[in-house]
Amino acid sequence: MTNMEPLDALFDDGPPAEAPIAPQPPDGALRDLAARLPRTMRLGTSTWNFPGWRGIIWSRGSGLTGLAENGLTAYSKNPLLRTVGLDRNFYRALTTAHFAHYAAQVPEDFRFIVKAPREVTDPYEREDRK
């Protein structure tokens, strides 16, 4: 085998999975693009805890364990991503304390898109809910 790159790609030499999660510092082009967008335009994703965003949303030194619990603050530091979906509300309605916990992790102008609970959106009772 002469080209070792594919074999090398099998081994993750990244940081320990438990390393703290930190935001990836945005480059100048990303900051400039965000500054040119209208403030009324909001971009975001359906979640903040996608592991493949290391080096894009999370710093290259970030671990991946705990993204669901600790990744929201880092996600909200990206100048383009000023909103995110709260999918878990579909499965079980979140409490006021949950919403307050999320809100405390982001800037004041950050927004959430909350998925309605399945009891509201489903026209039938699911087998797993009987």
What is the meaning of each model-derived region?
Residues 1-130:
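Residues lining hydrophobic/aromatic ligand-binding pockets adjacent to catalytic sites
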